[in-house]
């Protein structure tokens, strides 16, 4: 495996996934070589005047992996531990995810190495605007359309789209997605990824067990994805018995009441504490206990590589639905399938966010809007159809995992586009 940049375990695992998919699909090796490296990598150094008057520089990236299917599309994360190698892996996953969803997008990802919790609101705004200026030459409605990711949100997108609009001298709503409803956004975006995870779980449960009603679920992570996955799983009839974040686990055998998720803006430890108090149960301080609970469905919805070979034997769920990007290592996934546990891969399960971004982009390009109910209906239809296609492919190939079926389906669409263009 030839690379000219610093690698990480996450990037290596992603490349192995792509390589396996190319081989399973019977596609030529030069296709893998075309996907092995991004089309373009931008590294930026962003100056921010801090509240103490000093200038501090923050390193950032924008990785544009492949645009055979259309403009680059992918989020921007602000996190103190981001690396260029991991950003490349995430851009590759976006290429696969966008292809699998049938969207007219290629894959990209952006990042800034910063802990946004340590910035004041003014500092965060200056950093967001600085990043938008730094990447402006490479983005646009038909070039590259960023969105939020870990550590960023709709307010950060609002600052970025405002800064970009200033630079080009016109309102440019379609350049960034997941904006606030007050600034060309759509209210469904707040919960779209978590909603999509719940839809994926429901559709697979329907095919495995006849339905999701009454099935028990545990959700690891109470960020935007996890909190809304828990909420919508309950609304679809599952019994959410446990939720967790880095501070611990809240568990109640007869099921948790997670209705407050829709009403509260609380995040992280505050949300975990609120759920604990509302349900009258204590927080168990070991967050890893979430993986060993006896449940039907486990939703890892926090960060990558949390289900690993050193803890996978403790996983008791029968269905793992990946809300996060890359939460299950390849070795752990093999062990799960050997035990009959099905894993719904990230590029299928958590595509609700980018599908919603596509719907918002279409609205912005045409200066029209759909109401919340119509938007959610369109999102649900696309997610359900994607699950049906991948599940049918997986059923035909008995030796494959569902990830194999998803990756092959995504790669075939990319390959056909590249071949038609004359790139291969």
From Swiss-Prot:
<feature type="binding site">
    <location>
        <position position="97"/>
    </location>
    <ligand>
        <name>substrate</name>
    </ligand>
</feature>
<feature type="binding site">
    <location>
        <position position="193"/>
    </location>
    <ligand>
        <name>NAD(+)</name>
    </ligand>
</feature>
<dbReference type="InterPro" id="IPR046346">
    <property type="entry name" value="Aminoacid_DH-like_N_sf"/>
</dbReference>
<comment type="similarity">
    <text>Belongs to the Glu/Leu/Phe/Val dehydrogenases family.</text>
</comment>
<dbReference type="InterPro" id="IPR006095">
    <property type="entry name" value="Glu/Leu/Phe/Val/Trp_DH"/>
</dbReference>
<dbReference type="GO" id="GO:0004352">
    <property type="term" value="F:glutamate dehydrogenase (NAD+) activity"/>
</dbReference>
<feature type="binding site">
    <location>
        <position position="357"/>
    </location>
    <ligand>
        <name>substrate</name>
    </ligand>
</feature>
<dbReference type="GO" id="GO:0006536">
    <property type="term" value="P:glutamate metabolic process"/>
</dbReference>
<feature type="site" description="Important for catalysis">
    <location>
        <position position="149"/>
    </location>
</feature>
<dbReference type="GO" id="GO:0006103">
    <property type="term" value="P:2-oxoglutarate metabolic process"/>
</dbReference>
<comment type="subunit">
    <text>Homohexamer.</text>
</comment>
<dbReference type="GO" id="GO:0006538">
    <property type="term" value="P:glutamate catabolic process"/>
</dbReference>
<feature type="binding site">
    <location>
        <position position="224"/>
    </location>
    <ligand>
        <name>NAD(+)</name>
    </ligand>
</feature>
<dbReference type="GO" id="GO:0070404">
    <property type="term" value="F:NADH binding"/>
</dbReference>
<dbReference type="InterPro" id="IPR006097">
    <property type="entry name" value="Glu/Leu/Phe/Val/Trp_DH_dimer"/>
</dbReference>
<feature type="binding site">
    <location>
        <position position="73"/>
    </location>
    <ligand>
        <name>substrate</name>
    </ligand>
</feature>
<feature type="active site" description="Proton donor">
    <location>
        <position position="109"/>
    </location>
</feature>
<keyword id="KW-0560">Oxidoreductase</keyword>
<dbReference type="Pfam" id="PF00208">
    <property type="entry name" value="ELFV_dehydrog"/>
</dbReference>
<dbReference type="InterPro" id="IPR033922">
    <property type="entry name" value="NAD_bind_Glu_DH"/>
</dbReference>
<dbReference type="GO" id="GO:0070403">
    <property type="term" value="F:NAD+ binding"/>
</dbReference>
<comment type="function">
    <text>Catalyzes the reversible oxidative deamination of L-glutamate to 2-oxoglutarate and ammonia, thereby playing a key role at the intersection of the carbon and nitrogen metabolic pathways. Is strictly specific for NAD(+)/NADH as the acceptor/donor, since it cannot use NADP(+)/NADPH. May function in vivo in the catabolic direction. Also catalyzes at low rates the oxidative deamination of L-norvaline, L-2-aminobutyrate, L-valine and L-isoleucine, and the reductive amination of 2-oxovalerate and 2-oxobutyrate.</text>
</comment>
<dbReference type="InterPro" id="IPR006096">
    <property type="entry name" value="Glu/Leu/Phe/Val/Trp_DH_C"/>
</dbReference>
<protein>
    <recommendedName>
        <fullName>NAD(+)-dependent glutamate dehydrogenase</fullName>
        <ecNumber>1.4.1.2</ecNumber>
    </recommendedName>
</protein>
<dbReference type="Pfam" id="PF02812">
    <property type="entry name" value="ELFV_dehydrog_N"/>
</dbReference>
<keyword id="KW-0520">NAD</keyword>
<dbReference type="InterPro" id="IPR014362">
    <property type="entry name" value="Glu_DH"/>
</dbReference>
<dbReference type="InterPro" id="IPR036291">
    <property type="entry name" value="NAD(P)-bd_dom_sf"/>
</dbReference>
